[in-house]
Amino acid sequence: MISIKTPHEINLMKHAGLILQKTHKMLATFIVPGTTTQKLDSLAKAFYLKHNVTSAFKNYHGFPKHICTSVNEVVVHGIPTTKTILKLGDIITIDLGIYYKGYYADCACTYFVGDKTLTPPLITLTQTALMQGLTQIKPGNHFSDISYAIQTFANQHNLGIVKDFTGHGIGTSLHKKPYIPNFGQPHQGAIFKEGMTFCVEPMLTLGSPEIEILVDNWTVVTTDKSLSAHFEHTVVVTNSSYEILA
């Protein structure tokens, strides 16, 4: 059963989402050559403290930091460190999640380190793939319609689809049903209902979609070292479509 949120619950998640959006905006100003990923983590930690929220990632199944910082071939779950220093031309995914008054919000964005007019197509295409998926959220449609839309767009642009990680339900827990892969057939599974909250998050690569996990048991990289981008929104189903919460 996929839970239906009350207006009060949605407002709490919306507030958490607003803080995440502000965190992304703040961190984006520090995504420049010479910044360490540990500095980004420290900035996020301080920002969370100032806004009376807690990281959803810190100590989650043992994850050691407050945010995920995934650079270049790192697909997801990159651990911030003083050893990872951003360079001109890098791409970095910042994945944020917070807990606020019993509810979670989660969102991710891939950034280019350098002149934004030179942003690689992979980044803009992955963001577009996310939005293509979200356009499927309307009364009568199925969760698998999101999956099919993302898959179709990625295939049209010859991008690898990482299949090992999926979107997910969210609310009183960070990850819950439904799980929303970025591939599949349309018109299958659960149907959207007003008040459902979940995250959609395509992870696409310039090469192989195959991944491996490094010895830290967290960092996920493409096996062929190709670049990977990742975008994520937390959304709520409305009576006619959807609203982005984070």
Pin down the residues of each PLM region.
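Active-site neighborhoods and metal-handling regions in enzymes and metal-associated proteins
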Residues: 1-246
